[in-house]
């Protein structure tokens, strides 16, 4: 099951970083995808390295939506609680199907024979128009003991 968080304004780098870290703390969240307008390649205050649970990556978009793959509906309550804390300007949380999980004909055209080499965890996470180096960053959940 997927959930979309749609903030009522674009998020800056600091808010995006805080939101992703808090969402990563929720047990039922399996993976996250951020969407938004691409930041300019030159110096921009929001184009910086952010840290999510010890993993660093360059933020390349002004966050407009956060898509989450979750284990069950109970997780939505925890997601809303995080949004209430960090998004005082308003937001919508909507369950639905947002992240593709199957390879498509478009993927086959784009990637050709190398399609079989793409890990299943990357399916549905990449921007078809982006350069390979900008496609996706996977934030691995730390194993709990």
From Swiss-Prot:
The keyword Transcription regulation does not apply. Pfam families: MCR_D (PF02505). InterPro entries: Me_CoM_Rdtase_D. Keywords: Methanogenesis. One of its GO terms (biological process) is methanogenesis. It comes from the Archaea. MCR is composed of three subunits: alpha, beta, and gamma. The function of proteins C and D is not known. This is Methyl-coenzyme M reductase I operon protein D. It comes from Methanothermobacter marburgensis (strain ATCC BAA-927 / DSM 2133 / JCM 14651 / NBRC 100331 / OCM 82 / Marburg). The lineage of its organism: Archaea, Methanobacteriati, Methanobacteriota, Methanomada group, Methanobacteria.
């Amino acid at each position: 099951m997927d959930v979309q968080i749609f903030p009522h304004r674009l998020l800056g780098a600091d808010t995006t970083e805080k939101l992703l870290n808090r969402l990563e703390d929720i047990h039922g969240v399996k993976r996250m995808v951020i969407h938004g307008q691409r930041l300019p390649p030159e110096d921009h205050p929001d184009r910086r390295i952010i840290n999510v649970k010890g993993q660093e990556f360059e933020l390349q978009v002004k966050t407009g939506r956060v898509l989450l793959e979750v284990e069950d509906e109970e997780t939505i309550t925890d997601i809303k609680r995080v949004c209430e804390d960090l998004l005082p300007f308003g937001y919508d949380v909507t369950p639905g199907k947002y992240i593709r999980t199957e390879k498509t004909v478009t993927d086959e055209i784009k990637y050709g024979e190398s399609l079989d080499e793409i890990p299943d965890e990357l399916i549905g996470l990449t921007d078809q128009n982006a350069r390979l180096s900008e496609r996706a960053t996977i934030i691995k959940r730390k194993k709990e003991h």
